[in-house]
């Protein structure tokens, strides 16, 4: 519903601005430019979708091997000591804990098709424990915030788009996304725990969160000692090594569990073509809307206004061109994806804005969409502090993404 209003606004605002330009500024080129943008954007959307097929097939095949090889179960077992303490109101041994762990693990691996059904199942089980059926319980809210913070280990789709848009090193945003999504998730956990008065000062949580913070701090300190060329070389090398280790690990896990690895890969890869075809209408819709909005001059007005505000308080304005992706992400995943593609098309996949828009896309998730789907599935009407916690986690992800990208790029 939100995306519907945004899409309408793209056209209405663009039309109003174009009429003003025509009548009061004598700009006879604005309407031809807007119409040309609709054709160019439609063509771009189709070409991008077509080009995604091969890389999508590759990674969906690899993910299927990991899924059948028990990687999700292994990750769920690894996470269980931490998440048990984040959900103190859930009775020990209740089946919902398994669904929560599996959902978070699937999200971390980028297995959206598996994560959503597991998430809906977890929400139904949490509703069974909920005493006020129309009001979100504390475990529900913590679960939602963990989903909206966008914690991910493998940002496959973003790397795929970067490859299609001609990035020299599509994986160069891998480490920045890991760092930004860590801060987003950490902020979400801390903020929600403060609301719910969950004690994070126990040995397990201190060791886990403290250890993660030390590791991330060490990574940031290490990169801060290098110049930007060294940062780019090291981060790209590390990202590619990690991704290769993930592929090898998934294959070995499949072999260990006696999975026919080749058949599993083919089964998953088949979904690549279907996924690429399925996103064509969505990508056409959002890119055409953004194209018209940009061709009318409305996007430049928006960005220039934000730049003026940032400059007025003495801030650097290099990041402003990527902000439309960050602002769209809590509202719509497809809308933010369109903004990311538009930024790479306009400024270049290897530009600072192009890279930052990709990190924005990977550091948080679609807060309002997740709230609508998960809470709507069980009839929750009163969300309590869920929206506030989710949006604050998003804000932490956005701010950390900006800081990290200045360091890396």
Model-predicted segments: where are they?
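Membrane-embedded alpha-helical segments and adjacent helix-loop junctions characteristic
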Residues: 29-128, 257-346
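Hydrophobic alpha-helical context, especially transmembrane and signal-peptide helices
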Residues: 5, 33, 45, 94, ...
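Hydrophobic alpha-helical segments, principally membrane-spanning helices and signal/leader peptides
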Residues: 36-39, 46, 95-97, 132-140, ...
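Generic signal for short, ordered secondary-structure residues
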Residues: 101, 105, 140, 231-234, ...
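Generic hydrophobic alpha-helical membrane-segment signal
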Residues: 2, 91, 98-100, 135-140, ...
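C-terminal transmembrane helix pair
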Residues: 114-115, 122-162, 167-197, 323-409
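Signature of multi-pass transmembrane helix bundles
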Residues: 1-54, 163-294, 312-313, 385-409
